[in-house]
């Protein structure tokens, strides 16, 4: 039975997502010992690169999604089921920092499909969990997904496509802001629709998704190519003054929400 990872990466005028995906793929190879397939478009591919993905799948991106005034090409994640060449697949965001082999445990959790339903923000331990809206579901996260090529997993990805195609309708129904498409919101709805508007224990990764959020900086503690130790710094405002707070983390996977920070980590 084959096992691998799949990443989606489409460049826009602000960020080189291909470079992010290449960096993440190298860490997947190193820490997880898995091959990596990249889904991208022709214009995102560099003219020269020394890294070789297991497979590159070129698709036509949907560029209608806009964020911060530029195209945010994050639609089409539902294609992961059909485009993955593996029997068991890890679907990761290109800005997910792999620092251990912990994510491999997701394949022991479920027979079909699993994702995170809770988060922890570094330096923000009291941050509340996210909901679609005040009276709707708690958000599921598409940052880390594990799935197998099963009938039920296929149904989930087919439903994800349906939600994407009717995103504004579901925004009105669940009272969240439509327009800017979010994979997290689409997954939140698709998985519950397939399950009869509930969640199954095997669908949930039983540890928090670690986020690096706003007003937080991350610095690699060494120049090693596969460094796993970082200093996390937070500017804490107290009575009109800034107090810098620090922690050190090691061998901890985390998702970098601020792409500028991820680029800085790539560039050393």
Question: Model-found features: residue ranges?
Answer:
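Short, acidic, metal-binding catalytic loop of nucleotide-sugar glycosyltransferases
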Residues: 27-34
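A glycosyltransferase accessory/donor-loop signature
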Residues: 1-7, 17-18, 38, 51, ...
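Class I SAM-dependent methyltransferase SAM-binding "motif I" and its flanking Rossmann-like core
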Residues: 115-127, 131, 136-139
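Active-site-proximal specificity loops/subdomain of glycosyltransferases
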Residues: 45-84
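Conserved hydrophobic/aromatic beta-strand scaffold that supports enzyme active sites
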Residues: 80, 144-146
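GT-A fold catalytic core of metal-dependent nucleotide-sugar glycosyltransferases
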Residues: 58, 73-124
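Short, polar loop motifs at secondary-structure junctions
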Residues: 39-46, 61, 98-100, 205
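A short, glycine/small-residue-rich beta-strand->loop->alpha-helix junction that serves as a flexible
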Residues: 12-21
């Amino acid at each position: 039975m084959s096992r691998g990872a799949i990443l989606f990466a489409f460049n826009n005028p602000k960020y080189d997502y291909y470079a992010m995906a290449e960096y993440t793929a190298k860490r997947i190879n190193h820490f997880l010992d898995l091959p990596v397939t990249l889904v991208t478009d022709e214009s995102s591919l560099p003219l020269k690169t020394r890294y070789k993905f297991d497979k590159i799948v070129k698709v036509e991106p949907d560029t209608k999604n806009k964020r911060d005034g530029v195209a945010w090409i994050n639609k089409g994640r539902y294609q992961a089921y059909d485009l993955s060449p593996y029997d068991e697949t890890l679907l990761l965001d290109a800005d997910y920092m792999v620092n251990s082999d912990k994510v491999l445990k997701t394949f022991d959790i479920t027979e079909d499909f699993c994702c995170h339903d809770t988060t922890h923000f570094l330096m923000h331990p009291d941050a509340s969990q996210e909901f679609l809206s005040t009276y709707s579901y708690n958000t599921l996260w598409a940052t880390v997904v594990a799935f197998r090529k099963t009938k039920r997993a296929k149904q989930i990805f087919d439903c994800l496509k349906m939600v994407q195609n009717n995103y504004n309708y579901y925004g009105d129904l669940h009272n969240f802001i439509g327009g800017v498409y979010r994979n997290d919101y689409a997954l939140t709805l698709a998985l519950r629709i397939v399950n009869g508007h509930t969640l199954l224990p095997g669908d949930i990764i039983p540890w928090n998704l670690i986020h690096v959020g706003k007003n937080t900086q991350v610095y690699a503690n060494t120049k090693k190519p596969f460094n796993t130790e970082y200093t996390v710094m937070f500017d804490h405002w107290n009575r009109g003054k800034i107090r810098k707070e620090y922690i050190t983390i090691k061998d901890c996977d985390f998702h970098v929400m601020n792409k500028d920070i991820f680029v800085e980590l790539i560039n050393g």
